[in-house]
Amino acid sequence: MADKMDMSLDDIIKLNRNQRRVNRGGGPRRNRPAIARGGRNRPAPYSRPKPLPDKWQHDLFDSGCGGGEGVETGAKLLVSNLDFGVSDADIQELFAEFGTLKKAAVDYDRSGRSLGTADVHFERRADALKAMKQYKGVPLDGRPMDIQLVASQIDPQRRPAQSGNRGGMTRSRGSGGFGGRGSQGRGRGTGRNSKQQQLSAEELDAQLDAYNARMDTS
């Protein structure tokens, strides 16, 4: 059997789908166009991450006095223009190779029919940018995927505040929550927040380089 790294995106999905259907009998299969990819080492299967603590826990000592930068907690991609036959397993399999996923699922209406969109949550923003750059505009089941980066999920660090009655520093809780999201509800198509703009390849490269540079210096 050929190495999966040399197979196309749709061929890998069809291979795994056939393995899952051993006891179901051979039904009709969808013909997927070949998608050329570079060789990649596939990571561990998708797993549910451990929940993050809701409350901030005090540390014994904090030597930093600025604390202006936020702590990145992940990034979300909105994938649209999907064929209605694409499943949750397909989305998880496509995007898991770029990094650890918090969630990857197709959106369905109340009757259980696919809306042709999917939400993909990555633990790392850099992984989301790589996936967006790799798959944006790539056909899946004959329909080019439209991928948008949703506002980053940032957890602001708590800043130490100067006490007026004491000579030392005391830690105070930041008032901000998850930043970057607009006040509008979730919409589809042109009704989404106007701040969600599609990024060009150059902008994606610039964001990815800036992220890697920041991680190298931290």
Swiss-Prot record:
Consequence recorded when altering R29E: Abolishes interaction with NXF1
UniProt biased composition (Gly residues): 174-190
Record GO cellular component, one term: spliceosomal complex
Post-translational modification: Arginine methylation reduces RNA binding and enhances mRNA transfer to the NXF1-NXT1 heterodimer for nuclear export.
Keywords: Chaperone, Cytoplasm, Methylation, mRNA processing, mRNA splicing, mRNA transport, Nucleus, RNA-binding, Spliceosome, Transport
Modification type Asymmetric dimethylarginine: residues: R24, R32, R37, R40, R166, R171, R173, R181, R186, R188
Species whose genome carries this gene: Mus musculus (Mouse)
Location(s), subcellular: Nucleus; Cytoplasm
GO BP: mRNA processing; mRNA transport; RNA splicing
SUPFAM superfamilies assigned to the protein according to its UniProt record, in alphabetical order: RNA-binding domain, RBD
Biased composition (Basic and acidic residues): 1-14
Positions with biased composition (Basic residues): 17-32
Domain RRM: 75-152
Protein name: Aly/REF export factor 2
Region annotation (Interaction with HHV-8 ORF57 protein and with ICP27 from HHV-1) ranges: 54-155
Biased composition, class Low complexity, residue ranges: 33-45
Its biological purpose: Export adapter involved in spliced and unspliced mRNA nuclear export. Binds mRNA which is transferred to the NXF1-NXT1 heterodimer for export (TAP/NFX1 pathway); enhances NXF1-NXT1 RNA-binding activity.
GO molecular function: RNA binding; single-stranded DNA binding
Record's subunit section: Interacts (via N-terminus and RRM domain) with DDX39B and the NXF1-NXT1 heterodimer. Interacts with HHV-1 ICP27 and HVS ORF57 proteins.
Region (Disordered): 1-55, 151-218
Residue numbers of Omega-N-methylarginine PTMs: R24, R32, R37, R40, R171, R186
Region (Sufficient for RNA-binding, interaction with NXF1-NXT1): 16-37
PROSITE patterns to which the protein is assigned, alphabetical: RRM (PS50102)
